[in-house]
Amino acid sequence: RDSTTHQSHFRGGVGVTKISFKPHGFRAIRASVMPSEGQQQSSLGDSLVNSPHRNDVVDVIRKSAISNCLSETNLHNTVPGLVSKTRGKVRDIYDAGDYLVLVTTDRQSAFDRILASIPFKGQVLNETSLWWFERTKQIVPNAVVSAPDKNVTIAKKCSVFPVEFVARGFVTGSTDTSLWTVYNKGARNYCGNVLPDGMVKNQKLSENILTPTTKAADHDVPVTPDEIIERGLMTRSDYEEVSEKALSLFEYGQQVASEHGLILVDTKYEFGKANDGSIMLIDEVHTPDSSRYWIASSYPERFQNGLEPENIDKEFLRLWFKSHCNPYEDEVLPDAPEDLL
């Protein structure tokens, strides 16, 4: 058959989404796993790895996957009980009364806009967050109720603070609000943090800091703690509690990353308040979308030589777009090459 339709069922009756795809190249796949004459039958995995057709198979899978991303959902049109949809940059959020159904799509955002769609990215983000939510609930409770699908999380509703808490351990970044960008322009006090002269890009800070932002016209706007309180965005007690939890989460994330050969460079947290007044962690935790990760083993030498650290986050995509266009001002952006995705 030239095409098939894959149905992903949310367990518990939450919903159904359909993704159509066209898996070309079945001959190459079949050839890759068929043993030659005189060869003993090996496992499917070994046959694929050792096959002379391996590269053909990988290319078929890659090309098929790129055209079959989960870029849009409309569950509110078909699932009873979902009364409305809010489309975020990456997540489609459905109102289900006392709960929210959050579908993490494959959309890739940066510079406050959508850049591309990346196969299986939504699943990676959702399952990464769930892993961290489970391991950080001793630091702060979270809103997660269940995960009926690899791309879906059901969460408790709460009153969301209109402030994002960005925790940073290094002077780095390429966006307009990144610490290196503002530092390189001469800022020495950023979001209430006093920074010394003489720092260079990708240098480690003497201690972790918070650089809160708030939303204005779909853009992140840096704010100081005093501005947050004066503008009524948070009470002083809520801000102090949340900022303490954010730094504790970041320190724990850095510790776990270090144990796995990584550096958690910076990240973003969002919090809300439950009906009982308790603070809850929401949205996502320590994902490659909300965080920067570097390879720890190569960082010292690359830093000394003035090279960009090896990263496993979306910084490579940011850098590509920055070198090929103005992602903040250009109305139409170039398509990212398939090899990059």
UniProtKB/Swiss-Prot annotation:
EC number: 6.3.2.6
GO MF terms, alphabetically ordered: ATP binding; phosphoribosylaminoimidazolesuccinocarboxamide synthase activity
Subcellular location: Plastid, Chloroplast
Catalytic activity field: 5-amino-1-(5-phospho-D-ribosyl)imidazole-4-carboxylate + L-aspartate + ATP = (2S)-2-[5-amino-1-(5-phospho-beta-D-ribosyl)imidazole-4-carboxamido]succinate + ADP + phosphate + 2 H(+)
Keywords: ATP-binding, Chloroplast, Ligase, Nucleotide-binding, Plastid, Purine biosynthesis, Transit peptide
UniProt xrefs under Pfam families: SAICAR_synt (PF01259)
Keyword Nuclease annotated: no
EC class of the enzyme, as a word: ligase
Pathway given in the UniProt record: Purine metabolism; IMP biosynthesis via de novo pathway; 5-amino-1-(5-phospho-D-ribosyl)imidazole-4-carboxamide from 5-amino-1-(5-phospho-D-ribosyl)imidazole-4-carboxylate: step 1/2
GO cellular component: chloroplast stroma
Gene3D superfamilies according to UniProt: ATP-grasp fold, B domain, Phosphorylase Kinase, domain 1
Gene Ontology biological process terms, A to Z: 'de novo' IMP biosynthetic process
InterPro entries noted in UniProt: SAICAR_synt/ADE2_N, SAICAR_synthetase_CS
Classification via PANTHER family: PHOSPHORIBOSYLAMINOIMIDAZOLE-SUCCINOCARBOXAMIDE SYNTHASE
NCBIfam families in the record: PRK12607.1
Family: Belongs to the SAICAR synthetase family.
Protein known as: Phosphoribosylaminoimidazole-succinocarboxamide synthase, chloroplastic
Species this protein is from: Vigna aconitifolia
